[in-house]
Amino acid sequence: MTEPLKPRIDFDGPLEVEQNPKFRAQQTFDENQAQNFAPATLDEAQEEEGQVEAVMDAALRPKRSLWRKMVMGGLALFGASVVGQGVQWTMNAWQTQDWVALGGCAAGALIIGAGVGSVVTEWRRLWRLRQRAHERDEARDLLHSHGTGKGRAFCEKLAQQAGIDQSHPALQRWYASIHETQNDREVVSLYAHLVQPVLDAQARREISRSAAESTLMIAVSPLALVDMAFIAWRNLRLINRIATLYGIELGYYSRLRLFKLVLLNIAFAGASELVREVGMDWMSQDLAARLSTRAAQGIGAGLLTARLGIKAMELCRPLPWIDDDKPRLGDFRRQLIGQVKETLQKGKTPSEK
């Protein structure tokens, strides 16, 4: 049985000719071009972030200078001399049965012991603050690693430092999501998306509340000196609370070091970021025409507090920012503007009545 013939098919266009890939011609550089050659620069944001990290690392590391070694050696020698003299006085007082001198030696020993204990405690807290930077570097390495076996232990250590209980729902979801076939990058990424946002949300609430209090205080208070003292106290308290949320216990010197790092981070990042995030939006809304001078100053103080909180959050956070989850000033700006407007409207309503 023969099959029927198929109808003829006519093509309007010409047949496509097979095109071979074209390669670029070979380029050679002479000696003058080689001398003037400049490699391509990285993205400005990445370069700025790398410079900031380098500055933070240099600030956290103590400078091993000759003068520092001489001062430390002198203090150690003085401490040994004080201890030796105290032991000699104690022995002489015991032999001569001078109970008053013996009591004075005991009191001096207690004072010296308390001083040494406080120094050791401050050193431990300062060391813990430095370790947080190393943990952040370790987390960054794990996020680019394809190995196995280190990610889970690292994340469990972070959860323990932050005080997250094993029965916490977020930690339970993380345990249910990981398995043995996942590498360290996947395990740490799951922790960053399931557990870390719990602490970040608490830090955001602290920043939002402190920024709102600073804004309203400046907007309604007529005393500039009181405003400055209040803002300074609130900013220090905000940094302490953020550090506590992320499992860092601050002492006197570690608190000063963290506050110095926050200010250094803000100064090094420059005012361009502040202008980029806030300036254009302020110009579009024409806030200068809508708000009073005190209200505008209050918003500025609130944004400064928010910026301090964001930088403190960045320095105390054990993980680097992933997928652009870093909080921005714009996240707090609308809330501050709305609160100031609401406060001004409440102040005008009784006077109108």
Swiss-Prot record:
Residue ranges that the UniProt entry lists as topological domain Periplasmic: 1-69, 121-212
Transmembrane segments: 70-90, 100-120, 213-233
InterPro entries noted in UniProt: DUF697, UPF0283
Pfam family, one: DUF697
Cytoplasmic topological intervals: 91-99, 234-353
Keywords: Cell inner membrane, Cell membrane, Membrane, Transmembrane, Transmembrane helix
Source species, domain of life: Bacteria
A cellular component term, taken from the record's GO annotations: plasma membrane
Topological relation to the membrane, as annotated: Multi-pass membrane protein
Compartment(s) where it occurs, according to its Swiss-Prot or TrEMBL record: Cell inner membrane
Stored NCBIfam families: hyp_HI0043
Family: Belongs to the UPF0283 family.
Protein name from the UniProt record: UPF0283 membrane protein YcjF
Species assigned in the record: Escherichia coli O157:H7
Lineage: Bacteria, Pseudomonadati, Pseudomonadota, Gammaproteobacteria, Enterobacterales
